[in-house]
């Protein structure tokens, strides 16, 4: 075939194929070509993507695209003569150069050598088949192997649109580097670079990414997986299966050991969830209420090596030796001691059944991270009967959280009766009492110093983080905390060498507020040296945070009670301020009189009225009270509560331990550490505080509550005066919470022996629905108040309790 014939044939082929495309589109595309390259032969070029360049743009295509099967491909009629494969070489590559005109042919000498060559269609098809097979065997890494070779004219027109040219140039730079590594310098017409549909999606993705980066369009935020996740126990209830979900094995054992059967769990699933959530929060947390549970099991523990601490008679004062400062000032051990508790329950309670000589102090019942160290309980030395009262003051009402070294002798478990300090008269129980006491004092001093040092270092570290320049107050106030300089100096270097261990947020908050609390106390307290105002201090109680003393005031010779508290050992110092302010503002005949307060060195001295008769717990433990005497106690307590409620204060811990008596029978409320302020804007609380056996159902179930919780506790205290103990005292604390929440109003033994008016009084005070429960004012108007005996009729009960306590201590001493 001649050259003219070949040209005419090619022209006819080109024209026939161009008729399939819209003429306007093809014309626009062909006119946009700017490449001036010519067809070049590459004899041994490997199979790889080819690059189509339009100006500065490149586009990678696979070799197999050279002559696709699609009749619409421009590659078959790109305007150049059809090359002929020499010798059927399948590895040859073909390149063409764009031309300025639509139908202009290349006149470059390099293309002339192909002109006039015979058209070998069979060889060309063979080469195409071999190249296609080879491309399928080893496809290039990028882009992926193309399986469709159809080219859309519209797509080409869009890409070559003038409005997209600038963006396209920028877009191609993102992929140019990777494509250059895999492409050759072979050049084609720019319109031959059109991708297939598969490749179009890739280009579209790149184009969208580029436009988003240029226009600042928001991309989907990529959230990484959590790092170092900590699983928090979540307990639920499946209504379909009737089973708890996510209940830890420890909780399952705890429920079983506390006598809560699966049937009971299924009958009251929501109650169980509420109680267990409360336990989860408080068992490891800052709430002293849970640590009050300690004494509920203390009487189960065998008192090893302390034979004198064993009970000789049921009425023995419950509070005796469990002088554990973090313990639950819980109930005295009831006269009938529960014996059926499994051994596992004992594991729940701290090993404090008795003070074991020559042994390190027991670990606290709560997790170790709650308190850095806890001082060993110091055995009380033989003291006069005023102990009962002293122990009341040694209570740390100040902290509603942490096993606040609840100054050991506060509750019936340790505060009131002679039994509360069985070690007083136990010289025979220990070979050398002096050595034993010395060991305990040394252990206590070491533990207290460790706590102080740890807190001082954390305070110093916290202040350094908050501000590099020390505030004027801080050096002065922290200077008071430098009483253990030798120890803190030794501690500073290791503390600086390694970062301070991350404390819980609550602890950091307490440390950051320590200086402010001290500053507020300085504003509240009376300046001066209390040691010059009071003399003849006689220690009548000891707690981890300080001691309780009786003293006489210079000038008046009035006997007062002084509670000394080491501020550095108080977990929640702000509660001290709360207690002082409540007592200052609560001048009433039925509230223990607050006399004064002083900051003396590291200690806070709180001076109060001394109630030498002790607590009501002693009276109910050793005596049987008449309805008239019970009515008198209820009336005086209600008067004090009405005064508090009128000032927007909820006591939240009404029980016999916190009712003090004088030798004349006068009755006063004490222990305002759990008090809460309520007002018009916040007239409800939902914090679970108090002593569980006296808690109202709405407190146990963690509903909102108000003043009526004190009325429920008063009703329980009335039952306590009838039976000698509150309901469920023989049950484990967890089961007691369950029973309070599910049973509602407790049953009273021999209720038929009570007068109808007394039963009605109890019925109104123990309504489960707080809205239906009577108020303090309502109960003061109740007919039961007409039965009140004179307060002087209580004096014999106080004296009898003191005598019984003295006898009990004598028995312990002679054992």
Swiss-Prot record:
State the SUPFAM superfamilies in the record: Protein kinase-like (PK-like) (SSF56112)
**Domain of life, source organism:** Eukaryota
Where found in the cell? Cytoplasm; Nucleus
Q: Where is the Protein kinase domain?
A: 534-785
GO CC annotation, single: cytoplasm
For this protein, what reaction is catalysed?
Answer: L-seryl-[protein] + ATP = O-phospho-L-seryl-[protein] + ADP + H(+); L-threonyl-[protein] + ATP = O-phospho-L-threonyl-[protein] + ADP + H(+)
Q: Where is the composition biased (Low complexity)?
A: 68-82, 394-407, 429-455, 494-504
Active-site residues from the entry = 653 (proton acceptor)
UniProt biased composition (Polar residues)? 24-38, 89-114, 148-160, 173-185, 302-314, 411-424, 474-493
Q: Where is this region: Disordered?
A: 1-160, 173-200, 300-513
Q: Which residues cross the membrane?
A: none
Q: Which InterPro entries match?
A: CRIB_dom, CRIB_dom_sf, Kinase-like_dom_sf, PAK3-like, PAK_BD, Prot_kinase_dom, Protein_kinase_ATP_BS, Ser/Thr_kinase_AS
Per the record, the major location class is cytoplasm
Which GO terms are recorded in the biological process aspect for this UniProt protein? bipolar cellular bud site selection; budding cell apical bud growth; cellular response to hydrogen peroxide; invasive growth in response to glucose limitation; negative regulation of gene expression; negative regulation of sterol import; negative regulation of transcription by RNA polymerase II; osmosensory signaling pathway via Sho1 osmosensor
Listed EC numbers: 2.7.11.1
Q: What keywords are annotated for this sequence in UniProt?
A: ATP-binding, Cytoplasm, Kinase, Nucleotide-binding, Nucleus, Pheromone response, Serine/threonine-protein kinase, Transferase
GO MF, one annotated term: protein serine kinase activity
What residues does the CRIB domain cover?
223-236
Family from the record: Belongs to the protein kinase superfamily. STE Ser/Thr protein kinase family. STE20 subfamily.
Name under which the protein is recorded: Serine/threonine-protein kinase ste20
């Amino acid at each position: 075939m001649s050259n003219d014939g070949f040209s005419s044939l090619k022209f006819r082929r080109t024209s026939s194929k161009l008729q399939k495309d819209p003429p306007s589109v093809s014309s626009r595309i062909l006119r946009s070509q700017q490449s001036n390259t010519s067809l070049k032969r590459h004899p041994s070029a490997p199979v790889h993507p080819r690059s189509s360049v339009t100006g500065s743009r490149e586009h990678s295509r696979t070799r197999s695209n050279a002559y696709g099967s699609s009749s619409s491909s421009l590659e078959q009629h790109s305007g150049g003569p059809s090359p002929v494969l020499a010798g059927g070489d399948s590895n040859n590559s073909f390149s063409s150069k764009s031309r300025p005109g639509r139908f202009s042919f290349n006149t470059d000498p390099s293309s002339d050598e192909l002109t006039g060559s015979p058209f070998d269609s069979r060889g060309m098809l063979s080469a195409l088949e071999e190249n296609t097979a080879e491309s399928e065997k080893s496809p290039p890494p990028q882009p992926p192997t193309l399986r469709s070779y159809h080219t859309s004219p519209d797509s080409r027109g869009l890409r070559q649109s003038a409005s997209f040219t600038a963006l396209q140039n920028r877009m191609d730079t993102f992929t140019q580097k990777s494509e250059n590594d895999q492409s050759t310098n072979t050049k084609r017409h720019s319109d031959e670079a059109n991708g297939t549909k598969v490749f179009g999606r890739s280009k579209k993705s790149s184009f969208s990414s580029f436009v988003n980066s240029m226009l600042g369009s928001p991309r989907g935020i990529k959230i990484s997986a959590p790092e170092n996740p900590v699983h928090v126990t979540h307990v639920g209830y499946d209504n379909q299966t009737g089973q708890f979900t996510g209940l830890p094995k420890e909780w399952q054992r705890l429920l079983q050991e506390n006598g809560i059967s699966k049937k009971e769990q299924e009958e009251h699933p929501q109650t169980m969830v509420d109680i267990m959530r409360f336990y989860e929060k408080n068992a490891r947390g800052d709430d002293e209420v849970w640590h009050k549970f300690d004494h509920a099991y203390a009487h189960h523990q065998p008192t090893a090596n302390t034979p004198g601490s064993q009970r000789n008679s049921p009425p023995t004062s419950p509070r005796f030796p469990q002088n554990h400062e973090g313990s639950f000032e819980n109930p005295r051990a009831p006269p009938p001691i529960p014996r059926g508790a499994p051994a596992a329950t004992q594991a729940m309670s701290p090993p404090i059944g008795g003070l074991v000589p020559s042994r390190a102090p027991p670990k606290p019942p709560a997790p170790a991270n709650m308190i850095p160290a806890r001082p060993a309980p110091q055995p009380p030395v033989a003291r006069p009967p005023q102990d009962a009262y002293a122990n009341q003051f040694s209570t740390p009402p100040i902290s509603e959280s942490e096993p606040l070294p609840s100054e050991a002798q506060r509750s019936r478990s340790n505060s009131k009766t002679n039994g509360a300090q069985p070690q007083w008269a136990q010289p025979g129980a220990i070979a050398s009492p002096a050595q034993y006491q010395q060991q305990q004092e040394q252990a206590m001093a070491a533990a207290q110093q460790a706590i102080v040092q740890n807190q001082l270092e954390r305070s110093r570290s916290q202040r350094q983080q908050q501000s590099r320049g020390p505030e004027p107050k801080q050096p002065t106030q922290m200077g008071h905390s430098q009483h253990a300089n030798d120890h803190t100096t030794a501690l500073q270097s290791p503390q600086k060498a390694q970062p301070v261990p991350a404390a819980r947020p609550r602890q950091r908050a307490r440390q950051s507020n320590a200086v402010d609390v001290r500053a507020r106390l300085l504003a509240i307290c009376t300046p001066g040296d209390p040691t010059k105002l009071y003399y003849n201090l006689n220690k009548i109680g000891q707690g981890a945070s300080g001691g309780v003393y009786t003293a006489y005031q210079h000038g008046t010779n009035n006997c007062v009670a002084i509670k000394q508290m080491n501020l550095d050992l108080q977990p929640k110092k702000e509660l001290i301020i709360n207690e002082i302010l409540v007592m200052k503002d609560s001048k009433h005949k039925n509230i223990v009189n607050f006399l004064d307060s002083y900051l003396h060195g590291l200690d806070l001295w709180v001076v109060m009225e001394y109630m030498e008769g002790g607590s009501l717990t002693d009276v109910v433990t050793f005596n049987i009270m008449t309805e008239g005497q019970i009515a008198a106690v209820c009336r005086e307590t209600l008067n004090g509560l009405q005064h508090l409620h009128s000032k927007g204060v909820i006591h939240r811990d009404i029980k016999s331990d916190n009712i003090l008596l004088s030798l004349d029978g006068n009755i006063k409320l004490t222990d305002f550490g759990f008090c809460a302020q309520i007002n018009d804007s916040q007239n409800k609380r939902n914090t679970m505080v108090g002593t569980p056996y006296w808690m109202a159902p709405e407190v146990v179930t963690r509903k909102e509550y108000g003043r009526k919780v004190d009325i429920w506790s008063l009703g329980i205290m009335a039952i306590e005066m009838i039976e000698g103990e509150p309901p469920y005292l023989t049950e484990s604390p967890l089961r007691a919470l369950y029973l309070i929440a599910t049973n509602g109003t407790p049953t009273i033994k021999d209720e038929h022996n009570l007068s109808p008016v007394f039963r009605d009084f109890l019925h109104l005070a123990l309504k489960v629905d707080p809205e239906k429960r009577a108020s303090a004012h309502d109960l003061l108007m109740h007919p039961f108040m007409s039965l009140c005996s004179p307060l002087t009729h209580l004096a014999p009960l106080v004296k009898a309790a003191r005598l019984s306590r003295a006898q009990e201590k004598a028995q312990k001493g002679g054992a």
